[in-house]
Amino acid sequence: MKKTLRFAAVVSSLAASAALLVAAPAAAQALGSQGAQLADEVVAVVNNDVITGRELDQRVGLIARRLQQQNAPVPPADQLRAQVLNQMVLERIQVQKAKDDGIRIDDATVQATLQRLAQANGMTLDQYRGRLEAQGVPWSIFTNDARTELMLSKLREREVDGKITVSDAEVANYIASQRGPNASQQQDLRFQHIFIKAPTNAPQADIEAAQKKADALLQQAKSGADFERLAKNNSEANDAKKGGDLGFKSPSALPADVVDAASKLRPGQVNPTLIRVPDGFEIVRLVDRRQSQGASAAAPKIVQTHVRHILLRVGEGKSEGQARQQLVDIRNQVEAGGDFAKFARTYSQDGSASQGGDLGWISPGETVPEFERAMNNLQDGQISQPIRTEYGYHLIQVLNRREAEGSVQQQMDIARQAIGQRKAEQAYADWLRELRDSSYVQYKIGGVGPAN
């Protein structure tokens, strides 16, 4: 599970790089001439290595472009450069550590990762490379970024994630704490929320920009602005179109910080502070409370997805390109009013074809990772682009979602994953701080120093 999650993070980071590399030069130029003056100078010494002004300029351009795409304010040039340089120093230290420890990423592994990234975008590798190069992204730079991401992921797995253990006692205590001593008296909670993305492993500049954006939205919400409209226009969660309405949920299905906030709120009130969650910042408004239906209502919940698909297998006279294009054509026809179930019965090549491709209610972990990631990114009723898995190409449509109390094993798995993720994030932060403290770093430009 850990390796699957780390790979997803690698793919996500590379996808962001692909989108941003296109406009890096223009964004860097927009920050003024300061960077150009430093292009050939050393801006930081990191152990036996250096970071040049040219490298810094390129990264600043990427971050500035990302902020612009998110409609987030771009910090002043000096502040942004300092934040980005600190992030580059941390990255360089980790790369050095990985190389010293003998971590190598061979070409085959890089190619396999790029292949999966291309498939996630519904393309062959050649098509994906062609699109990037047509947009001005040198393939060699993108490939090198992929190698670095994989190297750092492997280093973290070895130094941190692989050492995290979660005991059965911790799992039992977690489940018991979620139920609480008075589970039969607990209340279900109905929230609206606004979610602003800012993963804990994102560049510090991104996190600070996301927090600034979230703070501004929080002030509007506290001042009486229409929360539903704020959520629809700004939230980055899948339920944004619903005004951020989460519906009624048991306390066990919500982050602990959200439940804690609810204890201090009356219906209609907005929590006065941002809530930090692993993937970003939450602004929450308590809509209502209701009595839970007994102790079982407080048990850890899972989100099940009602989904259907069309599968086309590759081989036996059907190439990758043919399978993908056929699904693109089917998708276009369904979007124009065609019957998904009818197409599934006619063309799908798995056992669900006779049911119109209906797979029923799917719980987390019951499908292959590529299918599950695509499914989780879809809104109700939305249809995916062709998705490649080991079985072939899929066209996926989400019909509905629901909360359900998982089996005992599923509840234990949820608890183990939550505990492990919390432990890993804290351990990684501690390890990275120790690694930074044991390294020699000298900044060569004014106004820059170690991040707090």
UniProtKB/Swiss-Prot annotation:
Keywords: Chaperone, Isomerase, Periplasm, Repeat, Rotamase, Signal. SUPFAM superfamilies: FKBP-like (SSF54534), Triger factor/SurA peptide-binding domain-like (SSF109998). GO terms for biological process: Gram-negative-bacterium-type cell outer membrane assembly; protein folding; protein stabilization. GO terms for molecular function: peptide binding; peptidyl-prolyl cis-trans isomerase activity; unfolded protein binding. It catalyses: [protein]-peptidylproline (omega=180) = [protein]-peptidylproline (omega=0). Disulfide bonds: none annotated. InterPro entries: OMP_Chaperone_SurA, PPIase_dom_sf, PPIase_PpiC, PPIase_SurA, SurA_N, Trigger_fact/SurA_dom_sf. Residues 186-288, 302-400 form the PpiC domain. Its EC number is 5.2.1.8. GO terms for cellular component: outer membrane-bounded periplasmic space. Residues 1-28 form the signal peptide. HAMAP family: Chaperone_SurA (MF_01183). The PPIase activity resides only in the second parvulin domain. The N-terminal region and the C-terminal tail are necessary and sufficient for the chaperone activity of SurA. The PPIase activity is dispensable for SurA to function as a chaperone. The N-terminal region and the C-terminal tail are also required for porin recognition. This is Chaperone SurA. It comes from Burkholderia orbicola (strain AU 1054).
